[in-house]
């Protein structure tokens, strides 16, 4: 009763109305210094809450990834839409290093001195380790040169590669027209090279880039975190900065590897 009288004397009838009992503070609230660091890392690296959690652990800061997600949502640093994920019931068979390596080509968005360049990408499905190189064309010779360099530089033996149905990778749709014997179509130079090296060459189904999911996802990472944030004025500068970016990628923790980096996954 004394609180009602005090409120009535102070605010009149307005003081007797019901008010929110929500607490004005919380004993376990995240410190403002940690919140500012989370926001800073999000704007700088544009990573998800789980990867930000690992980055903070490297700095000696322990915060649950759900707490980080709530902070990002409160600050408006998350996307405004949700994607519905379809969960299929299947048995995931772990792959060995080099068992399947996905290879694809990405157009460099920015022309240099009026010329178009192309990024060849190879990524190991088991460890997510990858290798990049820039070419001034994406023909058969570039594909073969890239595969030869990949074999020499990869820290594992490549048993099979997987590509799309581009003319720089296969003759699946053009070999019959170029061959005098339709029942024995001419093989693509890359297929002949794979036979010489003892490498199996898999092809994805037409119109199914999802079957090359690892390399397609890495290309999205390149677009969002390298090409959209990096400026280069010459071919040499592009190659240098791309090499640094790929080194950072191979030393970045991945959710698909349970927090390991591709270089760490190679040791297991």
Language-model region placement:
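A short acidic/small-residue loop/turn micro-motif
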Residues: 136-140, 177
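DNA major-groove recognition helices of helix-turn-helix
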Residues: 8
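Mobile genetic element proteins and their domesticated derivatives, centered on retroelements
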Residues: 1-4, 12, 37-38, 52, ...
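C-terminal domain-tail junction helix/linker
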Residues: 197-199, 220-268
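RNase H-like two-metal-ion nuclease catalytic core shared by retroviral integrases
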Residues: 163-165, 177-224, 243, 265-266
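Basic, flexible linker segments flanking DNA-binding modules
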Residues: 13-36, 40-101, 167-168, 174-188, ...
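Mobile-element integrase/transposase regions
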Residues: 62, 66, 73, 77-123, ...
